[in-house]
Amino acid sequence: SSTETPPSYNQLNYNENLLRFFNSKPVTAPVELDPPKVESSYVSSARGEDARSTLSPVQGFEGSGGSGSSGNFTTGSNLHMSSVTNTSNAGTGTSGTGNSGDGGGGGGANGTGSGAAPPVTLTESLLNKHNDEMEKFMLKKHRESRGRSGEKNKKSANEAMKMLEYSGPGPGHGHGIKRGGSHSWEGEANKPKQQLTLNTIGGGGGGGVGGGMPLFLDITHASSSSQNKGLAGVGVGGAGGVVGGGGSGTGLGGNGNVGSGNGNNNQPSTNQYTQSRLPCTQNINLWPPFSVGITTPTSVLSSHTAVPPSSFSPQHSLFPTFYYIPASIAASSPSSTNTNPNRPHKHAHVHNSSEKPSTSQAAAATMPLQYMTGVMYPHPSLFYTHPAAAAATAMV
């Protein structure tokens, strides 16, 4: 039987029915049709049990044998009918007179057992009634067993769900959950990088034209933060200088002050930057999420120096964008006597020339040209582009 349809009583009790039937040896035919070899004591005891079978059809199958010892073979399947069980099964019918004892088991019927009493049919009504009662009982037990198994399954499922809830999806586990390294843009993992970029990149070795101007710093704080000693070949005007090459420093020495390599911070270039009040902020996120790198305007000389791309220090996620910022001529350092309009080239070295800035360049130097932060301007060509033309193309 399937789990959906409850099994019938006959299916549940099939083996017990077979054992009970063959062990009880019932008589279902009249005595006249019995074979003559049947003993009289067996017939009389069977008739007496037929009379007692009005109480329950089970008692009709009990007490087979004239010796008086009633063999109760159905105790296992009739536990709930113990109150109806005939208690006087021990009969005295050994004389063959048909007196097999009175049926005082609660039914009140006296089994006279005379030879003229017709046998009671056991198969149609009484056995059907008994089967119905037993079927209800067995179905109840079956439902209880199924209910217990269902509760066990539910408990196990609930425990599994609770274990999943308690364990929880940790960092890096599960689908659709942000991994542990992906919060570096907004978490604390990016702060040390910003601090290193904002503080340690100072002037790296003096001697450059306007060397020592710190990269990616607030221009208004240049007087205080440019005193940091820069890293080797990183600072402005250093050995591998980013802006304003040609310095004689090794990248390790010098305070990186604006102007001369070791002079004080009193050069007019700094005053020009501080007075111009460029729209810069101090807290600049150099690694913004999902962006092409946005850089701040760096210090460019009055001769509009264009820096080759290969001279940039490897800053991750920074796009090589160039800015032209007009500035006054800083003639304090030794190398600034000859202004050198450096032109962008494929090689890392910078061509120095002794050309003087033309009148157009001087006019462009005085133009009030400012660039907005966060806006990417077009890349200059390999040939020299005049700042006025570059500004015109940028404004378009």
Swiss-Prot record:
Superkingdom of origin organism: Eukaryota
Subcellular localization(s) per the UniProt record: Nucleus; Cytoplasm, Perinuclear region
Skewed-composition ranges (Low complexity): 333-342
Resulting phenotype, T270I: In strain: I1
Location of region: Disordered: 27-120, 167-188, 253-275, 333-362
Key words, A-Z: Biological rhythms, Cytoplasm, Nucleus, Phosphoprotein, Repeat
Xref: InterPro entries: Period_circadian_regulator
Impact upon substituting G107D: In strain: A28
Gene Ontology CC annotations of this record: nucleus; perinuclear region of cytoplasm
Compositional bias per record (Gly residues), positions renumbered to this chain: 93-114, 253-262
Modification after translation, per record: Phosphorylated with a circadian rhythmicity, probably by the double-time protein (dbt). Phosphorylation could be implicated in the stability of per monomer and in the formation of heterodimer per-tim.
MF annotations from Gene Ontology: transcription cis-regulatory region binding; transcription corepressor binding
GO biological process, one term: entrainment of circadian clock by photoperiod
PANTHER family noted in UniProt: PERIOD CIRCADIAN PROTEIN
Role description: Essential for biological clock functions. Determines the period length of circadian and ultradian rhythms; an increase in PER dosage leads to shortened circadian rhythms and a decrease leads to lengthened circadian rhythms. Essential for the circadian rhythmicity of locomotor activity, eclosion behavior, and for the rhythmic component of the male courtship song that originates in the thoracic nervous system. The biological cycle depends on the rhythmic formation and nuclear localization of the TIM-PER complex. Light induces the degradation of TIM, which promotes elimination of PER.
Known partners and oligomeric status: Forms a heterodimer with timeless (TIM); the complex then translocates into the nucleus.
Identification of the protein by name: Period circadian protein
Organism: Drosophila paulistorum
Gene: per
